Amino acid sequence: MLCLCLYVPIAGEAQTEFQYFESKGLPTELKSIFKLSVFIPSQEFSTYRQWKQKIVQAGDKDLDGQLDFEEFVHYLQDHEKKLRLVFKSLDKKNDGRIDAQEIMQSLRDLGVKISEQQAEKILKSMDKNGTMTIDWNEWRDYHLLHPVENIPEIILYWKHSTIFDVGENLTVPDEFTVEERQTGMWWRHLVAGGGAGAVSRTCTAPLDRLKVLMQVHASRSNNMCIIGGFTQMIREGGAKSLWRGNGINVLKIAPESAIKFMAYEQMKRLVGSDQETLRIHERLVAGSLAGAIAQSSIYPMEVLKTRMALRKTGQYSGMLDCAKRILAKEGVAAFYKGYIPNMLGIIPYAGIDLAVYETLKNTWLQRYAVNSADPGVFVLLACGTISSTCGQLASYPLALVRTRMQAQASIEGAPEVTMSSLFKQILRTEGAFGLYRGLAPNFMKVIPAVSISYVVYENLKITLGVQSR
């Protein structure tokens, strides 16, 4: 009888032995998979129960809450294949061994920066013979009964632009794991993200419309506060007027997200290296180019959104009527007013948002990622809120100028202006503060927008058959 024994060291306790299962025979082709004793490092799983739960979740095919011999063997076979792929991706020199520099480079490619000392610490935990390199056998023995591959897990749990929608779709698109792309889960994530964005934008639409009104109409002579702005909107058009412009704002989510995703996949091939996952600067370049392509494609909808938000009661019967009147009165060029400041705003927004998010992600991973790369709800929401706020703060003057240019014809008698002349005019008449009109309601909507989009995203994932966190 062959008995597989698992020794699980628990910090502060004597080494405990657990007999997992017994079998009278083991197929010859599977003998290479097993070791009679497997040691699971205490820093990976602090308790046997936590370790067992992860193994059972990964291998339980019939969902009976238990792992029989056949399921366990299938889990080991499948997991070893995944480990082989990860090992090959880490082995940059193709010499059959992984050293500290290769670990640092692989994590750097994912945007996770660690020191050489940290890389050596990782090596020592797996290195059995003291060579400070890891061969395939050492890698397999260490990770075989660890149900998570850390590199894809980081991509899986730390999605950003797919989850969070604050109304400005200028963020760098998320990466998807190989498994997500092969199984078609990527489009489910995008659909869930689109639905979450629609609900989030609808819930925060009153604040978004107030922001647009303050960007266009507020000045030193017309000091518009938040309460006064809401009162003015309700007095002019009733409570329903708070949602003016929301229809087109929601409608543009689907085409923009689809174009952006497809463009990003193409840009990755142009700017990327041979690595499966892009480096941070490559992601920024590919994401910014994809964002520019998507924005160029749907920009007329951006102009319509601004005009619809600024309209007075009875001015337009709907979106199509608004578009027809703009076309008849101002021509096709009117649908691209503010295009240049909008394009220029992509780099600071996407760059700072990505940089801040990656910095916060790396800090958390280095300090707290022991058992899993899953940061939990509150950490993810906090990182998303902070990075989005920083990105908006950096690009806000350009966004304000874009909105004023889009709104030119909606203000009767307003002269035709360029981006540079509008900047000069604002600085001359209102000072630097004038470039940040409407910032308060814009920031007020970030936390509810992020929270609502996250909750809706998680629920839509379950509905669409995507495993929740």
From Swiss-Prot:
Biological process (GO) annotations?
adipose tissue development; ADP transport; ATP metabolic process; ATP transport; calcium ion transmembrane transport; camera-type eye development; cellular respiration; multicellular organism growth
Q: Name one GO molecular function term.
A: ATP transmembrane transporter activity
Q: Where is the EF-hand domain?
A: 47-80, 78-113, 114-149
Compartment(s) = Mitochondrion inner membrane
Per its UniProt entry, which superkingdom is the organism in? Eukaryota
Per UniProt, activity regulation is: Activated by an increase in cytosolic calcium levels that induce a conformational change of the N-terminal regulatory domain, uncapping the channel and allowing transport.
- Reply yes or no: does the keyword Kinase apply: no
PANTHER family, from UniProt? SOLUTE CARRIER FAMILY 25
Q: What is this protein called?
A: Mitochondrial adenyl nucleotide antiporter SLC25A25
**Species for this entry:** Rattus norvegicus
- Upper lineage ranks? Eukaryota, Metazoa, Chordata, Craniata, Vertebrata
